[in-house]
UniProtKB/Swiss-Prot annotation:
Pathway: tRNA modification; N(7)-methylguanine-tRNA biosynthesis. This is tRNA (guanine-N(7)-)-methyltransferase. The keyword Transferase applies. S-adenosyl-L-methionine binds at E37, D62, E89, D112. It catalyses: guanosine(46) in tRNA + S-adenosyl-L-methionine = N(7)-methylguanosine(46) in tRNA + S-adenosyl-L-homocysteine. Its EC number is 2.1.1.33. One of its GO terms (biological process) is RNA (guanine-N7)-methylation. Substrate binds at K116, D148. Belongs to the class I-like SAM-binding methyltransferase superfamily. TrmB family. The active site is at D112. GO terms for molecular function: tRNA (guanine(46)-N7)-methyltransferase activity. Pfam families: Methyltransf_4. Catalyzes the formation of N(7)-methylguanine at position 46 (m7G46) in tRNA.
């Protein structure tokens, strides 16, 4: 059981104090496009990405309190104001706090691969989730997935072309091991230093489906 560390940061939100769905225009004080990172870890990816896109508002969620604390500290240290951090379980948070059709982008980097065959049904990104998250992406919204686990990357790459309402932005490739302009987290860099390959997948929503 994780130890809950109090987080005193202007960038940390209590999901129970948000509406259903949340009024993100009020939260950020503007109506800029909204993007979501699921599993922000220590916040290095979202911090760099937010700096690159100052006119986009980012929500960074993580189930682990320690990661949320480190992410908030990083944002404060670098003066990044277009990110808000929430400790939450992904699916529940999305259903309760995100309006359908409102997300300009979703980023999922190196989620738990659940490597044992009997546990693979626990993986976050599967066909059911991809159908689910499409409802929350805006038309032309981007879906990014990255993993260092070969089986996970190959599995997602294999089923994504059959998912209605998405276009492959890396075609004719179904995945790539490098993605120009996409920031690497500390964990990605560690995996690559160990000789592992990162699988990058990028799709965009279409009017179909």
């Amino acid at each position: 059981m994780q130890r809950i560390i109090p987080i005193d940061s202007p960038f940390f939100l209590n999901p129970d104090e948000l509406g259903t769905p949340a009024d993100w225009t009020a939260v950020f004080g503007n109506d800029n496009p909204l993007a979501l990172e699921i599993g922000c870890g220590i916040g290095d990816f979202i911090a760099r990405t937010a700096l690159d896109h100052p006119t986009t508002n980012f929500i960074a969620i993580d189930y682990y309190n320690k990661g949320c604390l480190k992410t908030c500290s990083r944002l404060e240290r670098h003066g990044i104001t277009n990110v808000r951090v929430v400790r939450a379980e992904a699916r529940q948070f999305i259903v309760e706090r995100i309006q359908k059709g409102s997300l300009a982008a979703v980023y999922i980097n190196c989620p738990d691969p659940w490597p044992k065959k009997r546990h693979r049904k626990r993986r976050l990104v599967n066909t059911q989730f991809v159908r689910f998250i499409r409802d929350y992406l805006a038309p032309g919204g981007d879906f990014y997935f990255a993993t260092d686990f070969d089986d996970y990357g190959e599995d997602v790459a294999a089923f994504m072309p059959q998912m209605p309402g998405y276009a492959n932005m890396l075609a004719p490739d179904i995945f790539r091991h490098e993605l120009e302009g996409y920031h690497l987290s500390k964990y990605m860099q560690k995996f690559m230093a160990e000789g592992k390959r990162i699988y990058f997948i990028h799709y965009r929503t279409t009017m179909e489906g």
